[in-house]
Amino acid sequence: MNSLTIVTGLLDGDPNLALSAESILPAVKAGKATWLIKNSSSSITGNLLDYLNISGVKIIAESDSSLYGALNQALKHIDDGYFMIIGAGDTLSTGAVDFIHATLDSNPNLDGFYFAIQMAKSGNILLPRPSELGHRMACPHPGAVLSISKVKTLGGFDERYQIAADYDLLCRYVAAFGASGWSDQVVVNYLGGGISDFRMIEGFLEEELIRTRVCKSKQIEVCVRGLHFLGNTAIQLRRLGHG
């Protein structure tokens, strides 16, 4: 069985961490996964800290200036095998870790695997299509299970991107090692509500820059799509009475 590390990065704790723990700890207790929690402070205390005080859970409290900085620091503590990133409040679906292990074990030559995720609030399922990453965020990052050694050769997350560093890493990973494999099986229920939901325009522009730099999109296409996005956003705001 391949080594699997679940990584959660926090800037200053998160009340939703307990929700994630309920779905992750059974796999940890069964020896099927390790949970690495990278927090920029010592804010995980009390009953939650006691709850997490088991073998297989590692909490690292170090100062970080950004979420992707925290995740890069976390990756340094993983020696081998595969990892996936679960945000605070995200939960593993029933049997997810067993399915991930079975998939990896039956595909030993793949450098990574991409699974579907389900939006917790809407119930919508996002299916992975790594070959389409050059055009859109076609592999939701919570469903990506990647080789830690391969990610380290790429230098981890590019912290110059504040919103879309996850998309950048996936694009570079597929460009370097191929599309690998994917499954429409849901492994993560995604809570949402992260920074990309509140800074959509910045995220869009970062993604376009990534497509230009990594995926070799044409600059004129970037400009046109950016203008279309801004125009459509203005129309929606007017309809909502904000302009």
Q: What residues fall within each predicted segment?
A:
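A conserved acidic beta->alpha catalytic loop
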Residues: I37-L48, G87
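Cell-envelope/extracellular polymer assembly enzymes that use nucleotide-activated donors
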Residues: N2-T5, D168
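Conserved donor NDP-sugar-binding/catalytic core segment of glycosyltransferases
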Residues: T91-I125
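Short aromatic/hydrophobic "clamp" motif used to bind/position activated sugar donors
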Residues: F83
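Glycine-rich, basic loop-to-helix element that forms the pyrophosphate-binding segment
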Residues: A61-I78
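Conserved nucleotide-sugar donor-binding catalytic segment
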Residues: L127-I210
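Short beta-strand/loop segment that forms part of the nucleotide-sugar
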Residues: A21, G31-S41, K58-S63
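Short, well-formed alpha-helical segments that are part of the catalytic scaffolds
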Residues: D12-A27
